[in-house]
Amino acid sequence: MKGFDSKYKDLPDYILKITHQIWEEKDVESINQFYAKGMPTRSPQGVIYGAEPVVKATYATLKEFPDRQLLGEDVIWIGNDDEGYFSSHRIFTRATHANLGVYGEPTGKKLSYRVIADCACRNNQVYDEWLVRDQGAIVRQLDIDPQKYAHKLIQDEGGIDKCTIPFNQNTPNEVPSDGIYTPPIISKENIGIRYAEILKQIFSNETNAIKKNYDRAIQQEQPGGFTGHGREEVTTFWNTFISAFPDSKFTIEHISYTEEKNQASKAAIRWSLVGPHSGKGSFGNPSNAPVYVMGISHAEFGPRGIKNEWVLFDETIIW
């Protein structure tokens, strides 16, 4: 890869190794080397710029969870030397809540949850990042209700009028023009496009979308640390979530995919859902509050459709 250290054989190797170096080798200061100057890190909580706040947050997380492991389940990627590279890195995390931190007094509980990080890379650096963490899974394992956790965050920041506004469609983009990520040109027929069309059908409430496109034995990893098996449970998950936002707009934000010999075809989609909480579903009775959902989904395809799916959004931010 042009501009990258020769010790990295490809983009997945680069992503997996720098993640291990930063977190498990505890070389936190190497973030200053691997993160480009002024780069944005966007998450449901908001956006931060540059390496310094990432370094600070990493130290804080490692203090609270000193034995944290980041097991890279997959890196779905696209790109080339001319247009740059993009990775969607799905991580299964294990950690012990050992010290005081953002989740309160230490409980000694052992946690497991997923994170997906979408990174644009060039010249041995990450220069754009979108990150979604399964906060619902974390707080549930700490015996905290996600809605109550969200309420406490708001109160701790001084109430609704003073608290940090989550990332939304109006969040300013303060990235310099030379740091803006432009997706590489991809073919019109690939597994990423196919998955994007399936998600569009689901969010358009097409009744046969899941039956037509999912394997009967589908396993779906859901936000909150839940798992669904079979088309019926997958249908229930999507319907319950979507019914909370019947007047919202669903948008495909980014597509990446991997189609390699001797591997399942895989796709990664970053998507958004924008609109009022105007229906009854996953988030209780309608409040008509404006909502922005930052979601990332991964899928593996087999001969009978999607056989494994991972859906991630931060339900605590929605609450």
Task: Please name every model-derived segment.
Residues 1-319:
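C-terminal and inter-domain tail/linker signature
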